[in-house]
Each structure stands twice: as structure tokens, then as C-alpha cells.
Amino acid sequence: MKKFILPIFSISILVSLSACSSIKTKSEDNFHISSQQHEKAIKSYFDEAQTQGVIIIKEGKNLSTYGNALARANKEYVPASTFKMLNALIGLENHKATTNEIFKWDGKKRTYPMWEKDMTLGEAMALSAVPVYQELARRTGLELMQKEVKRVNFGNTNIGTQVDNFWLVGPLKITPVQEVNFADDLAHNRLPFKLETQEEVKKMLLIKEVNGSKIYAKSGWGMDVTPQVGWLTGWVEQANGKKIPFSLNLEMKEGNSRSIRNEITYKSLE
């Protein structure tokens, strides 16, 4: 990331928003195509990764879309591990766990060696440890989970009949526009949860600090669907306290590294 990435980002997005023309979407927000310069630059990041994707950036009620597959903005995909944000909110709000509780590793082999240890919810969020959040979902239970997902109006709100994998394989699906709006609401404490609960989860999402600005985000990788889908959803909190939500969505193809989502997002925020 360049030295002035976040300050430059905040200025450039203001310029692009003032110069763009609106198009119709399923969102109630005003949706805009970015300036030609930004569109070409960010499109090239997806092209270079040999994948198709979009990143949506929100300021106020204005949404700007960038990438080489803009139609993805309103298409539904499994949320994969981005659902950990809501999973944690629901679990903490309903006293199914605490931020200090240690989730014990059961000794079984996991997808990644880094998951093979005891973890708190915050540590599991940082490592995107699926088994920990599957256990949290089982504690919540199918009935309460469905009630809460509908109450928040997350995506298509359909969690099906199995409580511990609906965000990985479906039937729960969500659009990038809905994801960025969810991030916006969490960033500004507008979700229907206690302020304390939202603040606890937000602390788990801090992934980078640059020049006084912070990036809060959660990645997702839908490996069990075809084609595979990748996410990075969150917000930039500038030094002055202003928050700018974003959601990156792309197709994860063979040969794509785990870091491609962060790399494209960071470059797009320059």
C-alpha cells in the first residue's frame, strides 16, 4: 500500500461521485458509475488477476461501482465467511458466547493448520476459522438463527434446514450491494443490536492501519460452490472519523492466491 493510500482514496472518491451518472439498481440508494479514469484503473486489477469482479464503495447514500464485471453488483452469492460478522453479532447478543470465551480445538485435522488450536471469537474471526463459527451457529440453533437473519434482513434471509453451513453452500445468498449496506450499518452502529455488541464485533474486524486511518473488514471464500466466490467487505475509518464502506466480490479461480482479495481492494482504495 502506498504512503498516502487512504487520504488519496477519500479525495478521489469524492471527485468520482461528483462526476458520475446514475443507473438503476435494486438498491434504494443512488448507484453510480465511477469516473472513466477510476474505472479503467480498477478494471485492470481484476483483468491482471484473470478473474471477474466488482468493488462497491459507499459514501453517504451514494454507491460507486468499479471492476470488470459490474453486473455482479446486484447478483446473489453465498456470503461465505463474511457471515461471521452477523454470526458473531447474533451469538453475542443472545448470550451464546462471550468475547473472552475460549473455543477448544477438538484435536481433529482442519482445512488449515492455523485452525488447529484453541481460539476466542476474535482470534477465530482474524483467522476465519470456520469450525469455531459453526459451533457458535449450533449454539444459536436453527429457529433463533432464522429469526435473527430475517430481523436483520440479511440477503435473501433463507438459511434452510442446516444451521452450520447455510452461509457456505446456501441457501443464504446476498448481493454485493447488500453487503456494502450491511457494512455501512455496522460501521455506524445502525444494526438492530445493542451498541456494546456492535462495538465488540467491530473490534474483531480491524485488519490494517495506514497513516492514521483504519481498515475494518471480513474476507470470504465460497469454496463449496461453483464457480467459487471471494469477498472482502468492510469499511475505511479515516483519521477524522469518517467511515467509507466497501465490498469486493470476485470469482475465485484456480491459481488465485488467498491474498488476491486484499490486494485488489487495497489498490482500489488508493
How should these model regions be labeled?
Residues 1-23:
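Sec-dependent N-terminal signal peptides of Gram-positive bacterial secreted proteins and lipoproteins
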Residues 20-44, 139-141, 190-210, 219-270:
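Structured C-terminal helix/loop/strand segments within mature extracytoplasmic catalytic/sensor domains
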Residues 23-75:
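Beta-lactamase-like hydrolase cores
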Residues 68-74, 117-118, 126-133, 160-167, ...:
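Flexible glycine/proline-enriched surface loops and loop-helix/loop-strand junctions
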Residues 120, 135-183, 188:
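Mid-domain, small-residue-enriched loop/turn segments at the edges of structured enzyme/sensor domains
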